[in-house]
Swiss-Prot record:
One of its GO terms (biological process) is D-galacturonate catabolic process. Keywords: Isomerase. Disulfide bonds: none annotated. The keyword Isomerase applies. It catalyses: D-glucuronate = D-fructuronate; aldehydo-D-galacturonate = keto-D-tagaturonate. GO terms for molecular function: glucuronate isomerase activity. This is Uronate isomerase. The keyword Isomerase applies.
C-alpha cells in the first residue's frame, strides 16, 4: 500500500466504507488540549515550520534527544532552520513511531505537500511551507475552522481571569473556545509555593481563605466563574494516589503546615488529597461538569533537566503504581456513599490499569448514558496499538457505542489530523469485527456508531451546546 494513501490504516472493505462514508465527514470537538487561548485570540502568524511544529512539542523533543541532537537545537537558542533540519534527520529514523505518521499527515492535510521529510528534502519543504505560513489560512483561527473543529477546550488554572475566553466568546462565531479547570497548584502543596497560590486564589475569588472549607468555597466560586464562560470540565493529574479516610481529620492543620512549608507525613498528604478530590467530585456533580482524572505517570524524573529546562519538556514516563485501581476504587466507594460521583473520564498512562479501571467504573455507573468512561489511549499510548487496546478493552467490558472518543492533548494547532488517525483506527477495529462475523454487516447500524464515537457522543455528553439545542 502507498504511504498515507486514502486507505491508510484501513485493511478491509468494511473499514474503508465506515471511514469514507461515516467518520471522515464528522466535525471535531477537541475536549482536552493545551493550546494557549491568547494565541487563538491574537491569531498570531507563525514565521516558519519550527515555530508552529516544534515549539512546545515534547513528543518530538524526546525523539531528537534519542537521536543525539544537542539541546541547543531542541529547546535552546539554535537557528530555526537548523532545528528543523535536525528534526528532519531524526524523522528519517522514526519508522514505526506515530510521530512519523502524524507529521507527514499534517504536512499533507494542511500544506498539501506529499513528500517524505528527510535531510535531502528539508530545505525544499521548509521554503514551500513557510510561504504558506505567511498567509492568513495558517493563522490559528483559520487552522481550527478549516479543520472543522467546533469546540476547543483549553487547560486553565482556577486563578485565571479567562480574559481571552471572554473576548473569543464575543468575537469568534465559527467555533467555541471554552475553559477547563485544572487546579494543579492545589494538588502540589509541597512545592514551596502553596501559600502564595492560596493568596492568589483568595484574591481572584473574593473569599478569604482561613482553612480547608474556605479554600473549597473559593474553588466553588471559580467553578461558577468557569461555568459562566461555558466551562464543563475539570482535569486533575494524580501521578500516584493512595486513599485515606478523612473523617475527624484536622484538614486545617494540614493546610497550615503546607502553607508554612513544613514537611507533611505521607498520611497527612493522602488525607488532604482524598478530601480535596472528594470535594472536587462534589463540585463537578453540582455544576453538571465532567471530571477527568489522569493517573499513573512519573513526571519530570530527570532532576538536572527539570532544573535547567523546566516542566513539560519531555522528561516524563509511565507510572508503575500497581494498586492505583484499588485506591481509586476506595475513592469512588466513598463518593458513592456521599452520592457525589460526577460524570468521569479515567485515563491511566499504564495499560496494565485499563481492564481494572473499566471494570471498576462499571460498578458505579449512575443514571444517564455512560456516566463513567475509560478515556482514550493517553500520551505514550496515543499510538495505533494503544488505541486498539483501549477500544478492545472498552468494547469487551462496556458499551463502545457510548465512547466519547478522541482528543489531541496537544500544544499544536496542526494536531487535528490525530482525530483522523484515531477514526481510521476505530473504523479498522470495527470493520474487522464485521469481517470476522462478530457484529452485523449493517451499514446503517454500524455507521451510526462510528458517527457517534467520532462526534455525536461528545456533543451530547459534555453539553457544550445545551443552550442552543434547547432553543431548537
Amino acid at each position: 500500500m502507498k504511504f498515507l494513501s486514502e486507505d491508510f490504516l484501513l485493511t478491509n472493505e468494511s473499514a474503508k466504507m465506515l471511514f469514507h462514508k461515516h467518520a471522515e465527514k464528522m466535525p471535531i470537538i477537541d475536549y482536552h488540549c493545551h493550546l494557549e487561548p491568547a494565541e487563538i485570540y491574537e491569531n498570531k502568524k507563525y514565521e516558519n515550520l519550527t515555530q508552529i511544529w516544534l515549539g512546545g512539542d515534547h513528543y518530538k523533543w524526546r525523539l531528537l534527544r534519542a537521536n543525539g541532537i544537542p539541546e541547543k537545537l531542541i529547546t535552546g537558542d539554535g537557528e530555526d532552520y537548523e532545528k528543523f533540519l535536525a528534526f528532519a534527520k531524526t524523522l528519517e529514523k522514526s519508522f514505526g513511531n506515530p510521530i512519523y505518521e502524524w507529521t507527514h499527515l499534517e504536512l499533507k492535510r494542511f500544506f498539501h505537500i506529499d513528500k517524505l521529510i528527510s535531510s535531502e528534502t528539508a530545505k525544499e519543504i521548509w521554503d514551500e511551507a513557510n510561504q504558506m505560513l505567511a498567509t492568513d489560512d495558517f493563522r490559528p483561527r483559520a487552522l481550527i475552522k478549516n479543520s472543522q473543529v467546533k469546540v476547543v477546550c483549553t487547560t486553565d488554572d482556577p486563578v485565571s481571569t479567562l480574559s481571552y475566553h471572554k473576548l473569543l466568546a464575543k468575537e469568534e462565531k465559527d467555533f467555541k473556545v471554552l475553559p477547563a479547570l485544572r487546579p494543579d497548584h492545589l494538588i502540589s502543596i509541597t512545592d514551596g509555593h502553596f501559600a502564595d497560590y492560596l493568596t492568589e486564589l483568595s484574591a481572584v475569588s473574593g473569599i478569604e481563605i482561613k482553612g480547608f472549607k474556605t479554600m473549597i468555597k473559593a474553588l466553588e466560586q471559580r467553578f461558577e466563574f468557569f461555568t459562566s464562560l461555558g466551562g464543563r470540565l475539570s482535569d486533575h493529574s494524580l501521578s500516584t494516589y493512595t486513599f485515606a479516610e478523612t473523617k475527624n481529620v484536622d484538614l486545617d492543620s494540614i493546610l497550615q503546615k503546607a502553607k508554612e512549608n513544613q514537611t507533611l507525613t505521607d498520611l497527612e498528604y493522602n488525607q488532604y488529597i482524598t478530601a480535596l478530590i472528594l470535594e472536587i467530585m462534589k463540585l463537578n456533580k453540582k455544576f453538571e461538569w465532567t471530571m477527568q482524572l489522569h493517573v499513573n505517570v512519573n513526571r519530570s524524573i530527570n532532576g538536572p533537566a527539570l532544573s535547567k529546562i523546566g516542566e513539560n519538556t519531555g522528561f516524563d514516563s509511565m507510572g508503575t503504581q500497581a494498586n492505583i485501581s484499588e485506591e481509586l476504587t476506595k475513592l469512588f466507594s466513598k463518593a458513592a456513599e456521599l452520592e457525589t460521583i460526577p460524570k468521569t473520564i479515567l485515563y491511566s498512562l499504564n495499560q496494565n490499569d485499563w481492564l481494572e479501571l473499566v471494570t471498576m467504573i462499571g460498578c458505579f455507573q449512575g443514571e444517564g448514558v455512560q456516566q463513567l468512561q475509560l478515556g482514550a489511549g493517553w500520551w505514550f499510548n496515543d499510538t495505533k496499538k494503544g488505541m486498539e487496546n483501549q477500544l478492545e478493552i472498552f468494547a469487551s467490558q462496556s458499551l463502545l457505542s457510548n465512547f466519547v472518543g478522541m482528543l489531541t492533548d496537544s500544544r499544536s494547532f496542526l494536531s487535528y489530523p490525530r482525530h483522523e488517525y484515531f477514526r481510521r483506527v476505530l473504523c479498522n477495529f470495527v470493520g474487522q469485527l464485521i469481517e470476522n462475523g462478530r457484529i452485523p454487516d449493517n451499514e446503517a447500524l454500524v455507521g451510526k456508531m462510528i458517527e457517534d464515537i467520532s462526534y455525536n457522543n461528545v456533543h451530547d455528553y459534555f453539553g457544550f451546546f445545551k443552550d442552543e439545542d434547547s432553543n431548537q
